[in-house]
UniProtKB/Swiss-Prot annotation:
Name under which the protein is recorded: NADPH-dependent 7-cyano-7-deazaguanine reductase
Species of provenance: Rhizobium meliloti (strain 1021) (Ensifer meliloti)
Stored Gene3D superfamilies: 3.30.1130.10
Family affiliation: Belongs to the GTP cyclohydrolase I family. QueF type 1 subfamily.
Assigned EC number: 1.7.1.13
Classification via PANTHER family: NADPH-DEPENDENT 7-CYANO-7-DEAZAGUANINE REDUCTASE
HAMAP family according to UniProt: QueF_type1 (MF_00818)
One BP annotation, GO: tRNA modification
InterPro entries in the cross-refs: GTP-CH-I_C/QueF, NADPH_dep_7-cyano-7-deazaG_red, QueF, QueF_type1
Broad class of enzyme this protein falls into: oxidoreductase
Superkingdom: Bacteria
First-listed, main subcellular location of the protein, grouped into a coarse class: cytoplasm
Length: 154
């Protein structure tokens, strides 16, 4: 079993206040320890919250992030705090989704990353936002993101 060096982490195991904005949030990474092996890491945030930049009303999404590491893993507590920092952040659905993906790509330089953000309806229209860095590595198992298309009461 590989022992992961966590000595450089500032949030894991510490009491940390919730960042007031995504810009303040500190994303941290740890070495993957499995170089040469392609595998998929999935994070699911079924209760993601941000604010509408126009009305200040809350927006809710079910977000699924999949990535194939290339040396680095995102430290999950820092990711949780980063995602929670959007709770008081006003931005459109598309902006939130792409900002999350780009911050992770910048931090990790993964072989591949995709994000699916399934936003709950506002004004009667659900908005789903999808983005990925390119084609996934050949041979990796990519399960469906598992979020059904919004049907309302149909």
């Amino acid at each position: 079993m590989t022992k992961t060096d966590v000595s450089g982490l500032s949030q894991l195991g510490a009491k940390v206040d919730l960042p007031q904005s995504p810009e303040e949030a500190v994303l941290e990474r740890v070495p993957s320890g499995h170089g040469g092996t392609d595998f998929v890491v999935r994070f699911t945030a079924p209760e993601f919250t941000s604010l509408c930049p126009m009305t200040g009303q809350p927006d809710f999404a079910h977000i699924v992030i999949d990535y194939v590491p290339d040396g680095w893993l995102v430290e999950s507590k820092s990711l949780k705090l980063f995602l929670h920092s959007f709770r008081n952040h006003g931005a459109f659905h598309e902006d939130c989704t792409i900002e999350i993906a780009k911050r992770l790509v910048s931090l990790l330089s993964p072989k591949w990353l995709r994000i699916g953000a399934y936003w709950y309806p506002r004004g009667g229209i659900p908005i789903d936002v999808f983005w990925q860095t390119g084609n996934p590595p050949e041979g990796v198992w990519l399960p469906d993101q598992g979020v059904p298309t919004y049907r309302g009461r149909g």
